[in-house]
């Protein structure tokens, strides 16, 4: 049963404690990366057989496999994918940054070019649920950014094939190449390249402890989006909120994983107790009730504060992945929210909307990193290059200042490179 605690009566350590993965996979992941780097496809296939219990002859999804998957996918679900994709494109298209040029001084031009990375790798977890939504959320921003090739890697099922709904989502989103591999071996393949998998410049997407550690270890060889931890939700609610709604929202994240975190922060003890009772009613109704039970009992908590301002202060300190703001006039509080991956406003906006259909991204910072990190966006798939042009006359006007600055730093070679062009 979820624990109720009164803010101010328990330690901050208890209030702000988070679930943390306890398994140490650093050495195991390093070995996987080394093998894939040295042996390419052969190593990826061996690890796929070892971890996923399936032999793969070809790491890439063929056109025939894609066609078969599309015929097996319910047309109504494909229509839902297309509707979700349209909303995701509409939102992320507003994120596109423009290059700029400044030439308001004679003989001087400075500017910035926004350039997409050449190739992006997208990781989509397999496991107990096919995450076709993650395909849309991670591939579409890359395509909007202008990435030339998007590689999608996801583990195969026991039949050696990718779930048809995942392939259908890949088709809708525009993935260019699909790799039947998961785990650290897939991250290594995209980071270093193999016979079948070209090297990516950026790798994005959530995953288990092996995937997270692999992304950490290959960072610097490639860029990554973030190192994602377990799923999180914090519901900030006043006493007028419907306890059944709040319990359902908490369970929507608790069912993800046994180490997922579901937290309610409220100014009403009465509501807290009603939500606790609702959780006990609703958990047995879930298909993934065993997972949700462990998550709620081990990592769930209800925090009761004196007022809504304190509720918001607690939310900012926790900096959750998902934050639901279940209060009257939620936009009055929006400016007070400083740290959250994604905020769901009002009493009729469950975070499931954001997971699938609303349009904003669902690949979000976890473990408090929302204090300094952002959701996945078009920005993750572009880089910026600056450029500078000076005529000889424009250089002459600044050469003395450049030289003085350089000499102050003890870099006389810098000074000379500016002055030599103005002599004679």
Give the role of each language-model region.
Residues 1-118:
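N-terminal Rossmann-like NAD(P)+-binding subdomain of aldehyde/semialdehyde dehydrogenases
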Residues 102-168:
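Conserved small-residue-rich beta-alpha loop and adjacent elements
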Residues 137-148, 171-173, 191-197, 215-217, ...:
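Alpha-helix C-terminal capping segments
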Residues 148-158, 262-268, 275, 346:
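Short internal beta-strands
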Residues 174-245, 249-252, 256-261:
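Conserved NAD(P)+-binding/catalytic subdomain of aldehyde/semialdehyde dehydrogenases
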Residues 226-298, 302:
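A conserved active-site cap/scaffold subdomain adjacent to cofactor or substrate pockets
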Residues 316-424:
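C-terminal core of ALDH-fold dehydrogenases
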């Amino acid at each position: 049963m979820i624990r109720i605690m009164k803010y101010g009566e328990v330690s901050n350590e208890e209030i702000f404690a988070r679930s943390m993965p306890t398994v140490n996979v650093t050495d195991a992941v390093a070995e996987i990366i080394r093998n894939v780097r040295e042996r390419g496809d052969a190593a990826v296939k061996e690890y796929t057989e070892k971890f996923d219990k399936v032999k793969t002859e070809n790491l890439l999804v063929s056109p025939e496999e894609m066609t078969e998957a599309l015929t097996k996918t319910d047309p109504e679900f494909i229509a839902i994918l297309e509707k979700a994709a349209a909303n995701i494109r509409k939102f992320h298209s507003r994120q596109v940054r423009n290059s700029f040029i400044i030439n308001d001084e004679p003989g001087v031009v400075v500017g910035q070019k926004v350039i997409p990375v050449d190739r992006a790798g997208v990781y989509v977890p397999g496991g107990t649920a096919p995450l076709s939504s993650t395909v849309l959320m991670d591939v579409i921003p890359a395509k909007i950014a202008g990435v030339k090739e998007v590689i999608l890697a996801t583990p195969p099922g026991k039949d050696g094939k990718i779930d048809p709904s995942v392939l259908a989502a890949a088709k809708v989103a525009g993935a260019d190449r699909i790799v039947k591999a998961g785990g650290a071996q897939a991250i290594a393949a995209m980071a270093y390249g193999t016979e079948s998998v070209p090297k990516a410049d950026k790798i994005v997407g959530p995953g288990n402890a092996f995937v997270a550690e692999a992304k950490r270890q290959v960072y610097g060889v490639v860029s990554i989006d973030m190192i994602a931890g377990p799923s999180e939700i914090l519901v900030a609610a006043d006493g007028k909120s419907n306890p059944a709604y709040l319990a359902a929202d908490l369970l929507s994240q608790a069912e993800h994983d046994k180490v997922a975190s579901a937290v309610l922060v409220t100014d009403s003890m009465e509501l807290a107790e009603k939500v606790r009772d609702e959780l006990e009613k609703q958990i047995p109704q879930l298909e993934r009730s065993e997972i949700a039970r462990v998550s709620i009992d081990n990592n769930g908590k209800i925090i009761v504060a004196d007022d809504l301002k304190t509720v918001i202060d607690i939310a900012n300190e926790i900096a959750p992945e998902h934050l639901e703001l279940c209060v009257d006039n939620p936009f009055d509080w929006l400016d007070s929210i400083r740290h959250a991956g994604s905020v769901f406003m009002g009493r009729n906006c469950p975070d499931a909307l954001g997971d699938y259909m609303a349009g904003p991204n669902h690949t979000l910072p976890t473990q408090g990193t929302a204090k300094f990190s952002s959701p996945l966006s078009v920005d993750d798939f572009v880089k910026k290059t600056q450029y500078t042009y000076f005529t000889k006359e424009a250089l002459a006007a600044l050469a003395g200042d450049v030289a003085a600055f350089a000499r102050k730093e003890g870099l006389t070679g810098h000074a000379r490179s500016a002055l030599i062009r103005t002599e004679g």
